[in-house]
Regions:
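Conserved catalytic cores and adjacent C-terminal regulatory segments
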Residues: 1-382
């Protein structure tokens, strides 16, 4: 009897300690932005409202999204947005606010996705790679000296996937890899160009790292990781150097931004006769990847679903305002989705409350701000 009482007291204290740890420990914050489409309306609407709410709830008119997230991931058009809001302006601050980034994408969209001049008998629609290259170089360079920024030149860890035809496997660009070796450091415009090389619209993009030792023949990252959230979660869980306090998903706070889900009507219409265009197949694959990842993460965070928030639009909203007013969707643990009472706008508001309560990110700035000595060199010196 006495033993049972002692055991109960021990477990009660352990439970209190665990609950106290869950309440007080600072979670690692992940922002993930889907690929898909060329306008980024859903992600753009969410980013604008996210930044607006951060500034409103902190009372800081200069606060930016990168201040409150520990890592940002993006694919396709989402990768361009992710790179813009994390690129270092040279003083340790983001090169673009979310408002500026969305404005640039909107203003230069016709140049990013400019139709390529083709012959009279060419039936396949292609986009101009030269035009996209020019815009990306212009956008992802330092304003003062025109320096083309690299993965190391980011104020927060960045993660962007593509599919490498040379190795027939996904290739994930990261600041962590870039800081370890110049062979894994790539210019940001090339990284964004790689993840947006949709097979039906662009030819594969061939490029090398800054030291010329690593080469890649890339196509759209959306084919394998249109929703890069799982890649970001895995990266954080296995990167103890940058995220030493993370032991499991219970230590994470995740915001995943979709880029609009197809209703499927158009795809069925095109494919009913047994013929599918390349673009149709790519869209179906990308949507399938995004939904699968969302379902997996819904299961992983089922014990505390408020730690994982997915913002998506079901093809109904055509403007940013309509996207934010749509009711949110939540993946259920054993399949299916539930329509929530809260709108996408309200869900972002609630998420920002938790962000602000946990304070600004305490991760170190861009590796380029420090000595050129790598962690490996430091370890060897010891």
């Amino acid at each position: 009897m006495e033993l049972s009482k002692v055991t109960l007291e021990i477990f009660s204290k352990l439970e209190q300690k665990w609950l106290s740890h869950c309440e007080t420990s600072k979670k690692t914050r992940i922002l993930s932005i889907d690929g898909g489409g060329t306008t980024g309306i859903v992600a753009g609407a969410a980013l604008l409202h996210l930044e607006q709410q951060i500034r409103l709830q902190t009372g800081d008119s200069d606060a930016q999204i990168a201040d409150f997230f520990d890592i940002v991931a993006g694919t396709g058009i989402g990768a361009i947005l992710a790179a813009m809001i994390t690129a270092d302006d040279g003083s340790g601050r983001p090169l673009y606010t979310a408002k500026d980034a969305v404005h640039v994408i909107t203003e230069k969209n016709s140049e990013l996705y400019k139709p390529k001049t083709t012959g009279v008998f060419c039936r396949r629609r292609r986009l101009s790679s030269r035009s996209m290259d020019s815009v990306l170089k212009q956008v992802l360079q330092r304003r003062e000296d025109g320096k083309l920024l690299t993965l190391k030149d980011t104020c927060k860890p960045l993660l962007i996937p593509c599919f490498d035809l040379k190795s027939s496997a996904p290739f994930v660009f990261s600041r962590a890899g870039a800081s370890e070796s110049p062979s894994f450091n790539f210019e940001l415009w090339k990284v964004c160009r790689a993840t947006t090389a949709t097979p039906s619209l662009f030819k594969p993009f061939h490029f090398t790292s800054v030291d010329g030792k690593t080469s890649c023949s890339a196509v759209d990252g959306g084919l394998v990781m249109n929703n890069p959230t799982a890649a970001a979660v895995t990266h954080v869980l296995h990167n103890k150097r940058d995220f030493p306090t993370v032991n499991g998903v219970e230590d994470l706070l995740v915001l995943s931004l979709g880029n609009g889900a197809s209703s499927g009507t158009q795809a069925r219409k095109i494919c009913d006769n047994g013929e599918c265009s390349t673009s149709c197949v790519v869209d179906i694959a990308a949507d399938g990847v995004s939904e699968t990842i969302d379902q997996m993460l819904g299961n992983a965070f089922c014990w505390n679903h408020t730690d994982y928030v997915r913002i998506q639009a079901m093809g109904l909203g055509r403007t940013r305002e309509e996207v934010l007013k749509e009711r949110g969707l939540e993946s259920l643990a054993f399949g299916g989705k539930r329509l929530l009472k809260e709108s996408n706008e309200e869900r972002i508001d609630s998420f920002v409350q938790r962000l602000v309560a946990s304070g600004k990110s305490s991760l170190p700035p861009s590796p380029c701000k420090h000595s050129a000595v790598t962690p490996l060199a430091v370890a060897e010196a010891r």
